[in-house]
UniProtKB/Swiss-Prot annotation:
<feature type="binding site">
    <location>
        <position position="210"/>
    </location>
    <ligand>
        <name>S-adenosyl-L-methionine</name>
    </ligand>
</feature>
<keyword id="KW-0949">S-adenosyl-L-methionine</keyword>
<feature type="region of interest" description="Disordered">
    <location>
        <begin position="515"/>
        <end position="740"/>
    </location>
</feature>
<keyword id="KW-1017">Isopeptide bond</keyword>
<keyword id="KW-0539">Nucleus</keyword>
<feature type="compositionally biased region" description="Low complexity">
    <location>
        <begin position="761"/>
        <end position="772"/>
    </location>
</feature>
<keyword id="KW-0489">Methyltransferase</keyword>
<dbReference type="InterPro" id="IPR025790">
    <property type="entry name" value="Suv4-20_animal"/>
</dbReference>
<feature type="compositionally biased region" description="Basic and acidic residues">
    <location>
        <begin position="35"/>
        <end position="51"/>
    </location>
</feature>
<dbReference type="GO" id="GO:0036064">
    <property type="term" value="C:ciliary basal body"/>
</dbReference>
<keyword id="KW-0517">Myogenesis</keyword>
<feature type="binding site">
    <location>
        <position position="98"/>
    </location>
    <ligand>
        <name>S-adenosyl-L-methionine</name>
    </ligand>
</feature>
<dbReference type="GO" id="GO:0005813">
    <property type="term" value="C:centrosome"/>
</dbReference>
<comment type="function">
    <text>Histone methyltransferase that specifically methylates monomethylated 'Lys-20' (H4K20me1) and dimethylated 'Lys-20' (H4K20me2) of histone H4 to produce respectively dimethylated 'Lys-20' (H4K20me2) and trimethylated 'Lys-20' (H4K20me3) and thus regulates transcription and maintenance of genome integrity. In vitro also methylates unmodified 'Lys-20' (H4K20me0) of histone H4 and nucleosomes. H4 'Lys-20' trimethylation represents a specific tag for epigenetic transcriptional repression.</text>
</comment>
<dbReference type="GO" id="GO:0046872">
    <property type="term" value="F:metal ion binding"/>
</dbReference>
<comment type="subunit">
    <text>Homodimer. Interacts with HP1 proteins CBX1, CBX3 and CBX5. Interacts with RB1 family proteins RB1, RBL1 and RBL2. Interacts (via C-terminus) with FRG1.</text>
</comment>
<dbReference type="InterPro" id="IPR001214">
    <property type="entry name" value="SET_dom"/>
</dbReference>
Amino acid sequence: MKWLGDSKNMVVNGRRNGSKLSNDHQQNQSKLQHAGKDALKTGRNAVERRPNRCHGNSGFEGQSRYVPSSGMSAKELCENDDLATSLVLDPYLGFQTHKMNTSAFPSRSSRHISKADSFSHNNPMRFRPIKGRQEELKEVIERFKKDEHLEKAFKCLTSGEWARHYFLNKNKMQEKLFKEHVFIYLRMFATDSGFEILPCNRYSSEQNGAKIVATKEWKRNDKIELLVGCIAELSEIEENMLLRHGENDFSVMYSTRKNCAQLWLGPAAFINHDCRPNCKFVSTGRDTACVKALRDIEPGEEISCYYGDGFFGENNEFCECYTCERRGTGAFKSRVGLPAPAPVINSKYGLRETDKRLNRLKKLGDSSKSSDSQSVSSNTDADTTQEKDNATSNRKSSVGVKKNSKSRALTRQSMPRVPAASNSTSPKLVHMNNSRVPKKLRKPAKPLLSKIKLRNHCKRLDQKSTSRKLEMGNLVLKEPKVVLYKNLPIKKEREAEGPVHAAVGSGCLTRHAAREHRQNPGRGAHSQGDSLPCTYTTRRSLRTRTGLKETTDIKLAPSPLDGYKNGILEPYPDSGQQPTPEVLEELAPETALREEASQECPKSDSCPSRKKFRQGKPVKHLAKTEDCSPEHSFPGKDGLPDLPGPHPDQGEPSGTVRVPVSYTDSAPSPVGCSIVTPDSFTTKDSFRTAQSKKKRRVTRYDAQLILENSSGIPKLTLRRRHDSSSKTNDHESDSVNSSKISIKLSKDHESDSNLYVAKLSNGVSSGPGSSSTKLKIQLKRDEESRGPCAEGLHENGVCCSDPLSLLESQMEVDDYSQYEEDSTDDSSSSEGEEEEEDCEDDFDDDFIPLPPAKRLRLIVGKDSIDIDISSRRREDQSLRLNA
C-alpha cells in the first residue's frame, strides 16, 4: 500500500502550481548562480540545497535549513534506499519492492538541474537492479537471521563487481551513510526485532506490496525501535526532481511542525495505512523516527499507521484498509455486491471499536455468519493471520469463562454471592457483564430464554413425592426474559406428617414453604384439624396434602411486599373471568395447607441451615415481624371464594383469603431469588409477622424481573433485604417515605381481561422514570385442563389460595428446565403472588421498602450480571426497576 503522500504531495503540488512559472524562473536563476559551488562539491548535496532554501519562494524553503535532517539529502536517501532494498528485501521477498528512482530524469524536472550537477552525480536517479545474484543474496539474509552479524552480512552483500563501480564515486561519509542504511534493513531480520516483512497483494495501488507484521506481543505505548523511518527534508526543487505523481510519491508527508515536506523511507515505509491504526510514528531524533504501539498488538497482527484524513481521496473515500472493509466505508462503500454498511456494535449507543468488541464480532462471525461478522472475517486474507490469532486467543479465554460458569452454576446453591459468569454462546451478551450497561443493551438476551422449561423441576418433584401426581391446569406464561433465581435451596428438616407427608420435596423447597413452617404457630386463622409438623415443602407437596378442613372465606389480596419477597408478581385471572368452582377448590386447599403449615410451625423450630446462610446478617427484624400476626383480609373484585363455599358472583368472592404477607420475615439476598408464597392470612392492618422464624435460613435477594418474550412486557418482583425495615404493617404510614416503593396492580379492562397493569411509585417523584412506571402482565389460563385437576384437589381436601401457585410444576413456564428447581419455584410462586396483588385494586398505599442491597443480580439464561447499587440513589433504583 502506498505509504504517505498522494494527497499530501498533491497539496504541496497544488500550492506550488499557482506560481509555477515564477517559481521555476527564480529557481533556475538561483540554480545557475550556484552551479560553480555545486561543481566544486560534487560529493555532497548540502551546498546544492542551501541556495534553494535561501532563494526559493515556497513557505518551507525559506526556513534556511543548512543541514539535511538525516545526514543525507533527499536524493541520496532515495539512491541508498533503492540499493539497500534491492540487496536485502527483494531477494528475501522474491519480487522488486517500490523504488524511488524508477527511471532517468523526468523531462518535466530535468531543466531544474544544471549540467555540472547532473554530470557530477553520474545520473543518480537511475536505478539498475542487481541481476543474477538473487539466490546468493537470499542466502546471506538467511545466514544473518541465524548469526545476526551485521558486518559480515554487509560484506557479503557488497562483494560483487557492481560494488566497486558504485563506491568509486563515493566518499567515506557517503559510504558510511549507505552502510548504516543497509544495517537498518538487516536489523528487521533480527530475532528480537518483534516484526517481520511479508508480501501483501491486498491493495490495488500496488502490484507487489509488502506489510509489516508483529512477531511478538507488543503492549500499549511500547516503541518498536527497530522499525525505523529515515527522514530527509524535501525542497520544492527536489520534489520536482524526485517525485512522480502516482509512481513514487508514496512516502512523502508534510510536517506541520517543521513546515516542510519530508521524504520518509526505510523499513517504516512498508507500514500500511489503516483507519483504525494500532501504531503511530514518533520521532527518535532529527533524522529518524520509529513507531509506537497505540494498543496491545498480538503476534501475527499487522502493524498499521494512520496516513491522514485525505490521503486516499476526499475523506479517504478510496481507502482499502481492513477497517473500511469492516465498516463498509471508503472504497468498500460503493462496491457492488457488498451488504449495506451496518453498525458494528449497537451504534445507538456509540460503542467504540475496541479489540475485544472486534474479536467478539469475529467469534460471532464464526458461529452465526451474520453480515457484520462476515465483514470482520473478511479481514483475514490469505497473507495475514492477524484477526485469526486475535479470535483464537479470545476464544480460549471465553472457553475458560464457560468452564468457570459451569462450575459456578453447580455451586450457585452454596455460594449466593458468586456472580454467574456468561455462559451464553452468543458473544453479543458479553457486554452484559458490565455493571453499567444500559437496560436496552440487555434486550438481546430476549431469545435466550425462549425455550427454557420447568419440566426437569417437575420431574424432580414427582420423584420426591410419594403421593399421586395432581394434574394442575395449564397456565400459559410468556417465557421470562430476565430472571433472578435464588442460589440456596431450602432443605426440609422433617418429612410432613399425615397422609401425604412423603410428598414433601426436600431438594426443591421454595421459600414460601420456609415461611409457612416458620410462621407463628398461634396463627390459627385457618387452623385445620391436622397438625402438620414444621417442614419445608413445595407448593406441589402442599397441594398433595389431604385431610385438611375447609378454610374460611378466602380472598386473594396479598400486599405487594409479599410479591416483593416472594418473587414474580402473580397476576390473578381477570375478575370478568371468574374461575370455575373446581379452580376455586384448588385455590382453597392450597391456602389451607399454607395456613396450616404456618400455624403449626413453632417459633422454636428454627432452621440452622437458614441461620448459616444468613451468616453475619442481623436477625433482629425477625422479632420485629413476629408481633405483626393479625390476619390480613383484602376485599377485592378478583378474590376467590372459599372452595367449599358456593361459587360467588363474578368478581365478587363470597369469602376472603387471609394472606399472611411476611415481608420482613424473609431476608432477600442480592445474589439469588427465593420464592415465598403467602402461607397464612392476616388482616391488612398487620402483615405476617413470624419474624421469630427468622432463625430459619432465608435466601436474601433484591429484585426479580421477568419480561414476557412475545410482548416484551416485564414482570417485576421486589424483595426487601433482610436488613431493611422489618415492620411491614407500618407501610401505610411510610407511604411518603422516599425509601419505599409501592406496586399497584390493576386489571386493564380496556384491552384484555387477562391483562394486568402494575403501577410503581416510590412515594416521591421518581423523576424521568416516573413516566415508565407501568408494568403490564398478561396471564393466559387453560380453564379446561384446570377443571379436573381442581376436582382432584378438592377430593383430597387440599385448599389452595391461588391457582398460579398450584400450577407451579405444569405451567408453560416449564420451558425453564435449565433453571434450578429453586428458580422454578421462584417464577411460579411469584406469579401466584402477582395474581393475588392484582386482586387488590383498592390496596393503593401498600409501600414496599426499597432493599438497601449492595448488589443486584440479573440472570439471563445462564448469563448473569451483578449491579452495584449501594451508591445509587433511591430514585435511580426505582428508575432501574421501572424499566
